[in-house]
């Protein structure tokens, strides 16, 4: 029995099982309950989406690199159902899930929370801001990516280009407490490491998990209604159904606020740092993120139906966060590189049987969108080794734009603790 259980936990399956078991504990089941067994659990995982998650990571060409952690979580925006998770290559070799346990500095993926707070404060995308670089703002010496000085630009352009000086300035004027509150309302846990009321929080000094970020961005996709990510549809024991998923939606933002965020993040995809995501061939919104010393790289993106977060972090033999520089034989790694391409590979397959939907409410913000900007995935090419490696160029900016010429921002650990031995008391039903 022990050998059978151990074999079942091998590969990526163990991360799914352990995530389900952790959720059962949160729902009031004890470790003794789980060890006794007798449960029939129907999970939210989608077989096609899960296979796509595993394949997209493997196809990246870097999944086997020593110390590299790649995490992915994908959720249905209207119900919070987790349809796919990539926690690692083999649970038996490493029990810490890269999807819902390991954390990484969020970088510029936190800028949408500042946008929402600004919109609530009456600021709109056409407002003009000083995008000069360098600038000293509230005691912080800041540079834009590559120290590019944009001069006076609109907030929309600042979002597309991920202009650090504008966002730190805006966060200070709106109120850093409001930016922090916006992140929490969207779904980022209040106890997230590094989530503080500080102007630089907008540059991503907090360290969430991919499940945290997929859930938070799903709130925008769901037009301001938050649902908690879940891996469980039904729990039955002894023939009795003890739990059935009935998603509870909580209003986090007014519909108009979420719609404006969605519009801005669509422009990040069509005109800005998230351009790789156009490869899914349907309307998408999202944000890249990179961090100081290249210690993490993110892409968090969504369609109206599905939100997915992809994170890359790296650790040394002692579990300390180290730079991603050199991953895949290239230079610095940014959100527009491996994370965005893994996201695009995954979403193209996971959503292949879903209707293409437009984001509602976009026309209120002058969206002439031209979704012909979205390419046909059959003509899309992800990075291949070695000709399409991430750029080796970098700069000294405190917050990276997420494009392949950016240098990231912030400092924090991308580690998390793992404890306990593999258990196989409750077998998930994909």
PLM features: what roles do these ranges have?
Residues 43-64, 72-74, 85, 91-100, ...:
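A penicillin-recognizing enzyme superfamily signal
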Residues 32-38, 66-70, 171-173, 181-185, ...:
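Short coil/turn segments at secondary-structure boundaries
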Residues 68-69, 92-113, 121, 125-131:
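Short active-site loop at a secondary-structure junction
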Residues 18-25, 74-89, 119-123, 151, ...:
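Glycine-rich, acidic and aromatic/proline-enriched surface loops and short helix-turn segments
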Residues 123-179, 226, 238-267:
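Conserved catalytic neighborhood of penicillin-recognizing serine enzymes
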Residues 361-430:
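Proline/serine/threonine-rich low-complexity "mucin-like" segments in extracytoplasmic/periplasmic regions
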Residues 141-147, 175-215, 231:
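Mid-domain, small-residue-enriched loop/turn segments at the edges of structured enzyme/sensor domains
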Residues 1-44, 189, 199-203, 218:
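Non-catalytic, structured segments within soluble enzyme domains
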């Amino acid at each position: 029995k022990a050998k059978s259980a151990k074999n079942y936990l091998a590969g990526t399956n163990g991360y799914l099982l352990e995530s389900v078991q952790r959720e059962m504990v949160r729902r009031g089941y004890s470790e003794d309950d789980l060890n006794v067994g007798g449960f029939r659990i129907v999970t939210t995982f989608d077989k096609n989406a899960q296979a796509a998650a595993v394949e997209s990571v493997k196809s990246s060409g870097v999944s086997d690199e020593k110390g590299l952690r790649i995490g992915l979580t994908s959720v249905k925006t209207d119900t919070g159902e987790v349809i796919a998770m990539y926690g690692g290559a083999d649970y038996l070799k490493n029990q810490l899930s890269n999807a819902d346990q390991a954390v990484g500095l969020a970088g510029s993926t936190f800028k949408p929370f500042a946008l929402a707070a600004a919109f609530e404060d009456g600021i709109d995308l056409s407002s003009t801001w000083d995008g000069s670089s360098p600038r000293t703002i509230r005691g912080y010496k800041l540079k834009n990516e590559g120290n590019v000085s944009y001069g006076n630009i609109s907030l929309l352009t600042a979002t597309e280009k991920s202009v650090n000086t504008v966002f730190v300035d805006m966060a200070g004027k709106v109120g850093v407490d409001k930016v922090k509150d916006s992140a929490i309302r969207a779904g980022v846990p209040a106890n997230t490491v590094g989530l503080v009321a500080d102007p630089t929080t907008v540059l991503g000094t907090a360290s969430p998990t991919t499940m945290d970020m997929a859930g938070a961005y799903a709130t925008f996709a769901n037009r301001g209604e938050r649902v908690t990510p879940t891996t469980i549809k039904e729990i039955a024991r002894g023939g009795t159904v003890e739990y059935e998923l009935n998603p509870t939606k909580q209003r986090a933002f007014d519909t108009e606020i979420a719609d404006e965020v969605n519009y801005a993040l669509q422009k990040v995809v069509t005109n800005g740092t998230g351009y790789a995501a156009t490869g899914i061939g349907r309307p998408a919104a999202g944000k890249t993120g990179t961090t100081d010393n290249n210690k993490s790289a993110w892409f968090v993106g969504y369609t109206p139906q599905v939100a997915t977060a992809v994170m890359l972090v790296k650790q040394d033999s002692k579990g300390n966060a180290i730079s991603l520089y050199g991953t895949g034989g290239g230079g610095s790694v940014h959100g527009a590189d491996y994370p965005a391409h893994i996201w695009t590979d995954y979403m193209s397959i996971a959503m292949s049987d879903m209707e293409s939907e437009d984001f509602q409410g976009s026309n209120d913000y002058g969206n002439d969108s031209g979704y012909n900007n979205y390419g046909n995935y059959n003509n899309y090419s992800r990075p291949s080794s070695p000709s399409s490696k991430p750029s080796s160029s970098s700069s000294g900016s405190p917050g990276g734009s997420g494009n392949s010429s950016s240098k990231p921002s912030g400092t924090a650990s991308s580690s998390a603790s793992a404890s306990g031995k593999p258990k196989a008391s409750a077998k998930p039903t994909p």
